[in-house]
Amino acid sequence: MTDRDRQPEDTTAPTGEPVVSKPYIMPDDPEPGSVELLQKEAAEARDRMLRTLAEMENLRKRTTKEVADARLYGITGFARDVLDIADNLQRALDAVPAEARAAADPGLTSLIEGVELTERSLLNALEKHGVKKFDPQGQKFDPNFQQAMFEVPDASVPAGTVVQVMQAGYTIGERVLRPALVGVAKGGAKAASAANSNEVN
C-alpha cells in the first residue's frame, strides 16, 4: 500500500452545525372526559396516600405504646410469684407475738430483724420495677382494688369502709397486680342513724 492509497484521517474540527434531533410529536387531542378521569384518579391516589400515612402514624403510636407496656408489665408473672414470698415473710413476722419479741433472746431478735430486712429488701426491689404495695385500711371499699371477703357489723365507721386487711394488695404501673383481701364494715353510721329513727317511731 502506498501513501496515496491511504485515506487521510479526518482531522478537521466539527463544522458548527447543530445536531438536530427528531421533533416531539404532540399526541392527538385527548378524548373528551379523560381530563376529568385523570383528575378523579389523582384524587383517589392522593386519598389512598393520605390514608396510608395516617395508618402508618397510628401503627407507630401503637407500637410505641406496646413497647412501653411490655417494658412496664413484662414482669407481671414473675412479680405475682414473688408476692407469695413477700406474704410468707409477713406471715413469719406476724407469727411471733409482740410479747415474745419483747422477751426474746438475742438469737431470736436477730432472726426477726433478718426476716424484716429481707422483706423490706424484697419490697424495695419490687418497687424499683414498678410494683407497689397498698394497704386500704380505713379507706372506702373500691372493688377495682379490693376484694371483700366478709362484712363486719361495726357502727363506729361508715358503711363500706375497709376495717380489716387480710392480705395487702399490689399494683404494677396503673394496673392491679393483686387485689387486697379485705373485711368491710356493714351498717355503720348511716345504718345506725336509720335504726335510731326507727326506734323513735
From Swiss-Prot:
Which GO biological process entries does UniProt record here? protein folding
Q: Where in the cell is it found?
A: Cytoplasm
Q: What is its main location?
A: cytoplasm
Q: Name one Pfam family in it.
A: GrpE
Which InterPro entries does this UniProt record tie to the protein?
GrpE, GrpE_coiled_coil, GrpE_head
Region ranges (Disordered): 1-32
Q: Name one GO cellular component term.
A: cytoplasm
The portions of this protein that span the membrane are none
* Keywords annotated in UniProt: Chaperone, Cytoplasm, Stress response
Molecular-function GO terms, alphabetical:
adenyl-nucleotide exchange factor activity; protein homodimerization activity; protein-folding chaperone binding; unfolded protein binding
Q: What does the protein in this record do?
A: Participates actively in the response to hyperosmotic and heat shock by preventing the aggregation of stress-denatured proteins, in association with DnaK and GrpE. It is the nucleotide exchange factor for DnaK and may function as a thermosensor. Unfolded proteins bind initially to DnaJ; upon interaction with the DnaJ-bound protein, DnaK hydrolyzes its bound ATP, resulting in the formation of a stable complex. GrpE releases ADP from DnaK; ATP binding to DnaK triggers the release of the substrate protein, thus completing the reaction cycle.
Similarity field? Belongs to the GrpE family.
Q: How does it assemble?
A: Homodimer.
Write down what this protein is called: Protein GrpE
Lineage of source species: Bacteria, Pseudomonadati, Pseudomonadota, Alphaproteobacteria, Hyphomicrobiales
Quote the gene name from the UniProt entry.
Answer: grpE
